[in-house]
């Protein structure tokens, strides 16, 4: 789990997301509180419940991006799910308990990687022996073996091809659910897993270079040194205490005034979410998982519905409300220039692969921001996503002709932007240009 302070978390999010300081602060404090709780006395630790967050704001202002960046920062089991993908228990589809099962799988992956790192040195030694076996055979004399070991460590044999046996992760025989059995998807029957255990772990022969073989062999040897029981126990503990669930599009399951039908099922999903957010025990194939201390961050645009359309009990379980504001021209300008992987930087890098140098003047960036603001206000406000539409339109000709213009430099100014997107800004009825 991350030990970043709230200020450091906000500063890290600032590298990718412009503005929305309130939302960043809320998630930073929530993340830090996870760490603070771990430092408490065990008797008090169980009493400290996470303060779940509801993020409200128009589309394209950074709600989902905050969750993506938070996942990388968290250093804890983190899963982002769309609320619209789940159905009420009793209907065909995935029920909300699957969220926790998926979260445990994420936890298993995290703990396994950590354990692999701990035994990597031992695994590397074993992997080297297996490479030598493949190169000189198991019956070679110690002198020959040492001679090849020296060459191997000096990198002289990196490109030599060898045959190695590695664990077969499964042949794509997926799992299936047993119809008509309640809770059947606790451990969706995974055929490859069952057969693998029955046959004592299958292996497959792979032909690869010496250099490329190391990653597979080290992973293979690491897994032999790791106790799966310990991994499962630690993953369940980590999920229960540090797990974070990001529920996107929660406004889509809010019951709207008037009209029944689909609304009944939407309300059913909310009812199913209640015990999960409040604290319940979910059965998984790794054992029962308590959700009392899992942090839930919900977000929605609430264009059609309002937060008050959610069930009152669910509203009560999301005590921290954060509003994200719509983006203005200055925000668009900063998104184009200041973020770590800004659109302008991406397009420059793409064109450099064709040996084409792309430059944007300051007034071109202003013009791009102007067009995006105008389209958002006159057509539909889709936030920062509008910039992708505008940029694609501006660079359409350049992208198409780039292979023929290699070795040249192109400077884009305000006049060029207006020439290529002027019609887009004026004829808002031309639906082919509107995202």
From Swiss-Prot:
Record keyword Cytoplasm present: yes
CDD domains, A to Z: RecA-like_HslU (cd19498)
Main localization of the protein described in the UniProt heading: cytoplasm
Gene Ontology MF annotations: ATP binding; ATP hydrolysis activity; peptidase activity; proteasome-activating activity
SUPFAM superfamilies linked: P-loop containing nucleoside triphosphate hydrolases
Annotated GO CC locations: HslUV protease complex
Subcellular location: Cytoplasm
GO biological process terms, semicolon-separated: protein unfolding; proteolysis involved in protein catabolic process
Keywords from the named record: ATP-binding, Chaperone, Cytoplasm, Nucleotide-binding, Stress response
InterPro entries: AAA+_ATPase (IPR003593), ATP-dep_Clp_protease_ClpX (IPR050052), ATPase_AAA_core (IPR003959), Clp_ATPase_C (IPR019489), HslU (IPR004491), P-loop_NTPase (IPR027417)
Family annotation (SMART domains): AAA, ClpB_D2-small
Highest rank taxon of the organism: Bacteria
Residues at which ATP binds: 18, 60-65, 248, 313, 385
Subunit (UniProt): A double ring-shaped homohexamer of HslV is capped on each side by a ring-shaped HslU homohexamer. The assembly of the HslU/HslV complex is dependent on binding of ATP.
Main function: ATPase subunit of a proteasome-like degradation complex; this subunit has chaperone activity. The binding of ATP and its subsequent hydrolysis by HslU are essential for unfolding of protein substrates subsequently hydrolyzed by HslV. HslU recognizes the N-terminal part of its protein substrates and unfolds these before they are guided to HslV for hydrolysis.
Family: Belongs to the ClpX chaperone family. HslU subfamily.
NCBIfam families: hslU, PRK05201.1
Protein name per its UniProtKB record: ATP-dependent protease ATPase subunit HslU
Designated gene of the protein: hslU
């Amino acid at each position: 789990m991350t030990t970043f302070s709230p200020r450091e978390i906000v500063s890290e999010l600032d590298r990718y997301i412009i503005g929305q300081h309130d939302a960043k602060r809320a998630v930073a404090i929530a993340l830090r509180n996870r760490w603070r709780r771990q430092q408490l006395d065990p008797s008090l630790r169980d009493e400290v419940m996470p303060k779940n967050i509801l993020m409200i704001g128009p589309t394209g202002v950074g709600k989902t991006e905050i969750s993506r960046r938070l996942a990388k920062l968290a250093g804890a089991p983190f899963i982002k799910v769309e609320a619209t993908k789940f159905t009420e228990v009793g209907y065909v589809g995935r029920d909300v308990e699957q969220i926790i099962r998926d979260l445990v799988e994420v936890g298993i992956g995290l703990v396994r990687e950590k354990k692999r790192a701990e035994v990597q040195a031992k695994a590397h030694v074993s992997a080297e022996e297996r490479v030598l076996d493949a190169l000189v055979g198991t019956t070679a004399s110690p002198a020959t073996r040492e001679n090849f070991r020296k060459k191997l460590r000096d990198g002289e044999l990196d490109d030599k091809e060898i045959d190695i046996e590695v664990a077969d992760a499964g042949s794509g025989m997926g799992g299936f659910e047993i119809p008509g059995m309640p809770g059947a998807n606790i451990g969706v029957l995974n055929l490859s897993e069952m057969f693998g255990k029955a046959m004592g772990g299958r292996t497959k022969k792979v032909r690869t270079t010496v250099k490329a073989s190391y990653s597979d062999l080290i992973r293979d040897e690491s897994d032999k040194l790791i106790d799966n029981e310990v991994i499962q126990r630690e993953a369940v503990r980590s999920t229960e205490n540090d797990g974070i669930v990001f529920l996107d599009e929660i406004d889509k399951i809010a019951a709207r005034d008037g009209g029944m039908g689909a609304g009944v099922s939407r309300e059913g999903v909310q009812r199913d979410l209640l015990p999960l957010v409040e604290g319940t025990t979910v059965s998984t194939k790794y054992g029962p998982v308590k959700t009392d201390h899992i942090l839930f961050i919900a977000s929605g645009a609430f264009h059609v519905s309002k937060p008050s359309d959610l069930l009152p009990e669910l509203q009560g379980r999301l005590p921290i409300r954060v509003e994200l504001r719509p983006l203005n021209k200055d925000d668009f300008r900063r998104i184009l220039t200041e973020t770590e992987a800004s659109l302008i930087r991406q397009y420059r890098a793409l064109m450099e692969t064709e040996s084409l140098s792309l430059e944007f003047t300051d007034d071109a960036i202003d013009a791009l921001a102007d067009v995006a603001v105008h389209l958002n206000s006159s057509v539909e406000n889709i936030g920062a996503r509008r910039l992708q539409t505008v940029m694609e339109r501006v660079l359409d000709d350049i992208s198409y002709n780039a292979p023929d213009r290699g070795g040249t430099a192109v400077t884009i100014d305000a006049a060029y932007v207006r020439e290529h997107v002027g019609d887009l800004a004026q004829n808002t009825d031309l639906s082919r240009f509107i995202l």
